Amino acid sequence: MKKNALLVFSIMLLALVGSACSVLGVGSKSFATEQSFQVGSIKAIEINNESWDIEFNSTDSNQITITTEGKQKDEKTDPVVIKEDGNKMIITQESKKAGLIDNFTFGKEGTINISIPKHGVEKIAVNNQFGNMEWNDIAIPAVDISTETGSTLIKGLTADIGKVTSDNGALSIRDSSIRELKVASITGDNDLTNVTSSSMKVTSANGSVSIKEAKESQSVVVHTKIGDIAVAYKDAPASLAVGASSHLADITVQLKGFKESVNAEQSKTGVIGKGLNKLELVSEAGTIDVR
C-alpha cells in the first residue's frame, strides 16, 4: 500500500512540475527575425494572426520592414512565416501546441511589428484570433481588420476605406481621417475621437459608442443593442438632420439651432439649418446623448 501511495504521489508531483514548466515557458526559446521589402513590389499585406500582438508604424524609409520577437515553442516550426504571393505579402503567425496547457495563454507571447511608408501599399487586411493591435500614423487606401479577441488602438490613420469587425475587445480610433468607415462590434466599447469621415457607420451588440470631437459629415449612423451612445461635436453643426430613438432609456439632444419636429419618450427628431447631413442614432437599451 505504501509503495502504491508513493507511486501515485510521484506521478502527481511530476505532473505538477511539468505543468509549472509549461506555464513558465520552460521548453520554449526566443524567436526574433527582421525582413525588409522594397516599396513598389508589394501591393497588399495580409496578416493571419493566432495569438501575438501586432504593431503598425509609419517610417520615412522606402522599405517595408517586418520584425518579430517572441516565443518559439517548437524548434522545428517557426511561429511566424512571411511569404510573397505575387504582389501580396502574407504573414502567418501560428503557435504549435504541444499539450493541453498550451491552449491557454500566460502573458505576452510575441509581437509582430510592421514599419511601412505612407501610401506604401494599397491594402492591409488583418485576421486576428487573439492579440492586441496598435496602428500609428499609417496612410493607405484600404484597411480591413477582423479580430476575435483583443483591443485595437488606431492613431493617425489616413484611409479611403476602413472596416473594423470585432467579436470581443475595445476599439479606440483617434486623430484619423477615413472617408468611409464601418465598425461592427459584438462585445466591447468603441471610442472615436477627432475622426473625420464623410460616411461613418458603427454597430454594437453589447458595448457603448462614444464619438468625441465629432465633425459634421454627410452621414453618421450608430446602432446599439445594449450600450449607450454619446456624440459630442467639436463645432456646432450648420446643416444636420437628427434622428434618435431608444426603447428603454433617455434621449438628450443639446445642439445650437436644433429645431425639434418630434419630441417623444422614445424618440427625438429635428433639423439644424437645411438638414443636408444626417445623424442617425438608435439604441434598444441604452441612453443617447448629443451635444
Residues covered by each model-derived region:
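Short acidic/polar N-terminal linker immediately downstream of export determinants
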Residues: K2-S10, L14-T77, A98-H119, K259-G275
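Generic detector of contiguous secondary-structure segments
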Residues: K3, N49, K71-E84, D228-S246
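Right-handed parallel beta-helix
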Residues: A32-G40, V80-T165, A170-R179, D189-D191, ...
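Exposed beta-strand and adjacent loop surfaces of beta-rich binding modules
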Residues: A44, Q63-T65, P79, V121-K123, ...
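Active-site alpha-helical segments that house and flank conserved acidic catalytic motifs
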Residues: I45-N48, V126, I145, A244
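Solvent-exposed coil/turn segments that connect beta secondary-structure elements
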Residues: T59-S61, E69-Q72, D85-N87, E94-K96, ...
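Short, surface-exposed interaction patches in beta-rich subdomains
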Residues: I173-S176, E180-K182, D191-R291
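N-terminal glycine-rich phosphate/adenylate-binding segment common to multiple enzyme folds
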Residues: I186
